[in-house]
């Protein structure tokens, strides 16, 4: 055992979170260090998605702290939160692809939002990421033209577009084929 483990990538301390006055998670604490993988497993309605929403800032915790790379996300101001958000990708349970946009446009969204890359550079990254997830040549397809597994892979390509240090998955295997 390493007496001096690396600093956590994610550190959650005494986190309580929920909706309105309903507490869903209470006093949750954990740390994830570089190269570690954390799976949150539990029954339907136990708070897995609520935890994800708290971790990525979609829900404000009732108490506690979420820190990334030693920087408090919970206490951060808007510019600091934006910088922290650039370090992770998220794949939602429903994949959250914009139905009116092609796959190329969907995957390009984080690149347009968080970088000043040229259109040609963004297109190159989009093509690479779609190829990496087995969707080469599908740039001009719309989400309605895809199977559930293909939508999940397109969402993965978008989550990986910025080469994030952390990737969050909500129901990661839902809709995936056993071979992919």
Tell me the role of every PLM-derived stretch.
Residues 64-73:
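Conserved ABC transporter NBD signature motif
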Residues 73-89, 119:
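ABC ATPase NBD coupling module
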């Amino acid at each position: 055992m390493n007496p001096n483990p690396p600093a956590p990538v994610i550190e959650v301390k005494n986190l309580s979170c929920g909706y309105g006055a309903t507490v869903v998670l209470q006093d949750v604490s954990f740390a994830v260090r570089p190269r570690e993988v954390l799976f949150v497993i539990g029954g339907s309605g136990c708070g897995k998605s609520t935890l994800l929403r708290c971790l990525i800032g979609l829900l404000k915790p009732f108490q506690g702290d979420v820190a990334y790379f030693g920087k408090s996300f919970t206490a951060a101001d808007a510019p600091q939160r934006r910088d922290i958000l650039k370090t992770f990708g998220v794949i939602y349970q429903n994949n959250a692809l914009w139905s009116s946009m092609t796959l190329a446009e969907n995957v390009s969204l984080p690149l347009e939002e968080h970088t000043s890359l040229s259109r040609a550079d963004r297109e190159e990254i989009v093509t690479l990421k779609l190829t990496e997830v087995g969707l080469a040549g599908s740039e001009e397809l719309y989400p309605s033209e895809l199977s559930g597994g293909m939508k999940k892979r397109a969402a993965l390509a978008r989550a990986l577009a910025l080469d994030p240090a952390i990737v969050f998955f909500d129901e990661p295997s839902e809709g995936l084929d056993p071979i992919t």
